């Protein structure tokens, strides 16, 4: 008796033209995630995952490289327009937005969504070096 051959369907990449770029920039690292309007992740990259280690992760150049890597993966989905949501106090905020703009992604809006406490938790004590 002949074995039945199962044909697998090839996964079709969906086309997303409008996306949201979430840039989280801390003092130690920068995370860039590009999602569709519903929040489903299309691509992401970090400055640590881009080959930077230690104090070099927190530089603006590392954030630029991470944003370029995330943009390259998002361009495969057909992304053209990007709303940018920036969160955190880090140094890679501006350079990541510029890198997205340089990759032919039209930045339609830039919004700062850094959470600000209405005097909630007590902050950590100040460093004495």
UniProtKB/Swiss-Prot annotation:
The gene is rpsK. Belongs to the universal ribosomal protein uS11 family. Part of the 30S ribosomal subunit. Interacts with proteins S7 and S18. Binds to IF-3. This is Small ribosomal subunit protein uS11. Keywords: Ribonucleoprotein, Ribosomal protein, RNA-binding, rRNA-binding. InterPro entries: Ribosomal_uS11, Ribosomal_uS11_bac-type, Ribosomal_uS11_CS, Ribosomal_uS11_sf. GO terms for molecular function: rRNA binding; structural constituent of ribosome. Located on the platform of the 30S subunit, it bridges several disparate RNA helices of the 16S rRNA. Forms part of the Shine-Dalgarno cleft in the 70S ribosome. One of its GO terms (cellular component) is ribosome. Pfam families: Ribosomal_S11. PANTHER family: 40S RIBOSOMAL PROTEIN S14/30S RIBOSOMAL PROTEIN S11. Coiled coil: none annotated. The lineage of its organism: Bacteria, Pseudomonadati, Pseudomonadota, Gammaproteobacteria, Thiotrichales. GO terms for biological process: translation. It comes from the Bacteria.
């Amino acid at each position: 008796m002949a074995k039945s051959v199962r044909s697998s369907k090839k996964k079709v990449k969906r086309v997303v033209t409008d996306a949201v770029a979430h840039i989280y920039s801390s003092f130690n690292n920068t995370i860039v995630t590009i999602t569709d309007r519903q929040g489903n992740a299309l691509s992401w990259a970090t400055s640590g995952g881009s080959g930077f280690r230690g104090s070099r992760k927190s530089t603006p150049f590392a954030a630029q490289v991470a944003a370029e890597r995330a943009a390259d993966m998002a361009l495969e989905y057909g992304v053209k327009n990007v709303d940018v949501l920036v969160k955190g106090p880090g140094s890679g905020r501006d350079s990541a937005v510029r890198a997205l703009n340089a990759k032919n992604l039209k930045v339609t809006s830039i919004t700062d969504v850094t959470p600000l406490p209405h005097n909630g938790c007590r902050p950590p004590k100040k460093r004495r070096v």
